[in-house]
Amino acid sequence: MLPSWTIGLLLLATVRGKEICYQPFGCFSDETPWARTCHWPFKLFPWAPKDIDTHFLLYTNENPNNFQLINITNLDTIEASNFQLDRKTRFIIHGFIDKGEDSWPSEMCKKMFKVEKVNCICVDWRRGALTRYTQAVHNTRVVGAEIAFLIQGLSTKFDYNPENVHLIGHSLGAHTAAEAGRRLGGHVGRLTGLDPAQPCFQNTPEEVRLDPSDAMFVDVIHTDSAPFIPFLGFGMSQKVGHLDFYPNGGKEMPGCQKNTLSTIVDVDGIWEGIEDFAACNHLRSYKYYSSSIFSPDGFLGYPCASYDEFQEEENKCFPCPAEGCPKMGHYADQFQGKTSAVGQTFFLNTGDSGNFTRWRYRVSVTLAGKRNVHGYIRIALYGSNANSKQYNIFKGSLQPNARYTHDIDVDLNVGKVQKVKFLWYNHIIDLFHPELGASQVMVQSGEDKTEHKFCGSDTVRENILQTLNPC
């Protein structure tokens, strides 16, 4: 519940349409372009910093489990902490009805410590986020100003380069990061938007929302981009970065179509279960990012005009072009062409659980046999690292000497493909006991374009495996 003086201030702002100032963070207007962005009948001011009560929780490799509280108006707390000036600093900013302490941001920090030396600051603005959505939208402006104030202080007092800062924001946190980046003139090194919030931000002016000018490099993961009305998509669909990733098309994530009960029981804790059911697609963005820290190669994004084109048989978006494909998530900034243009779109498919990783291959099967058969053909890859399960390549009329091609997303990194196993079946009783085989199987890796050719000389009855070796 808001303090009475704050309610009075908001009512006054509604009538007078002026600005409110919170020193040392500057002034905040309720006029265009911030007014009525949500079709809300009242103009709103952001709450005062003391009411939002933002906490900056510093975790480092030296204190991965217990944070050190940073006071942004007293940078002696930086000197007294484990903050290291020779390391990158990653800020992780939660979104609406969320928190930064004892939640996914601190868990993400712990994963980072396994792969790098880094300062990891969780921005906990839960009091400003646990209110009605439209008010939380405006509160992001103050939180963004506070983040910018801290980064500017690090630069001024310690000569810390803003290019070494990476802002990571989920939902409303993405636009909070954008506000911070904008206040710093876009000089922050990197900004990652994890399914930036759609309501109040979609198709608004750039100064209101996340856009590519907010940092030197902006990468975005879209996972819940269906229209808010009528589909209740919480994330933006429009391109707002240098690299915009749309896993699974950016709207419906695998594993998010379960029934209410199974979703709630599947996860740790009843509250997390309810939250996961209500916003499963929206939350996938930070889960994908977190998983990418350990498994970067399993989140390769392919440049493509649309998801439909990406899913087409023998699509033109496969394999990766000469300049390569970016890795969605933690290592997206390693992509050579990351800032060559804004609004570059990339597509990929993910798994429905676990670490969500997938490796894409194009498989072409040439059949051998004596007669046409109606049924299914499947292929398993056997590699230097692991062996895959059987993947469907085609169903329908199977014709000897015909070639069937399909792109598959393998759920583990098999390494170098050393052999393949072919299987066909039709589940129909056939008194003639037909036989089919694969005379040739071509397997191409999406990442490095390498092709492997396998040959066979046999035919087999249905549900009998045929092994093909290199030729």
UniProtKB/Swiss-Prot annotation:
Signal peptide boundaries: 1-17
GO MF annotations, alphabetized: galactolipase activity; lipoprotein lipase activity; metal ion binding; phospholipase A1 activity; triacylglycerol lipase activity
Keywords in alphabetical order: Calcium, Cell projection, Cytoplasmic vesicle, Disulfide bond, Glycoprotein, Hydrolase, Lipid degradation, Lipid metabolism, Membrane, Metal-binding, Secreted, Signal
Membrane topology: Peripheral membrane protein
Catalysed reactions, semicolon-separated: a triacylglycerol + H2O = a diacylglycerol + a fatty acid + H(+); a 1,2-diacyl-3-O-(beta-D-galactosyl)-sn-glycerol + 2 H2O = 3-beta-D-galactosyl-sn-glycerol + 2 a fatty acid + 2 H(+); 1,2,3-tri-(9Z-octadecenoyl)-glycerol + H2O = di-(9Z)-octadecenoylglycerol + (9Z)-octadecenoate + H(+); di-(9Z)-octadecenoylglycerol + H2O = (9Z-octadecenoyl)-glycerol + (9Z)-octadecenoate + H(+)
Principal cellular location given in the protein's record: secreted
GO cellular component: extracellular space; neuron projection; zymogen granule membrane
SUPFAM superfamilies: alpha/beta-Hydrolases, Lipase/lipooxygenase domain (PLAT/LH2 domain)
Intracellular or extracellular location(s): Secreted; Zymogen granule membrane; Cell projection, Neuron projection
Enzyme Commission number, as recorded: 3.1.1.26, 3.1.1.3
Regulation: Up-regulated by CLPS in the presence of increasing concentrations of bile salts.
Biological process terms in GO annotation: cholesterol homeostasis; fatty acid biosynthetic process; high-density lipoprotein particle remodeling; phospholipid catabolic process; phospholipid metabolic process; triglyceride catabolic process
Active-site residue list: 171 (nucleophile), 195 (charge relay system), 282 (charge relay system)
Residues engaged in binding Ca(2+): 206, 209, 211, 214
Residue positions the entry lists as glycosylated: 71, 355
Ribonucleoprotein keyword on record: no
Residue span of region Required for galactolipase activity: 93-105, 257-279
Domain named PLAT: residues: 359-471
Pathway assigned to this chain's UniProt record: Glycerolipid metabolism; triacylglycerol degradation; Glycolipid metabolism
Disulphide linkage map: 21-27, 109-120, 256-280, 304-317, 320-325, 455-471
Job of this protein: Lipase that primarily hydrolyzes triglycerides and galactosylglycerides. In neonates, may play a major role in pancreatic digestion of dietary fats such as milk fat globules enriched in long-chain triglycerides. Hydrolyzes short-, medium- and long-chain fatty acyls in triglycerides without apparent positional specificity. Can completely deacylate triacylglycerols. When the liver matures and bile salt synthesis increases, likely functions mainly as a galactolipase and monoacylglycerol lipase.
Family under the similarity heading: Belongs to the AB hydrolase superfamily. Lipase family.
Listed name of the protein: Pancreatic lipase-related protein 2
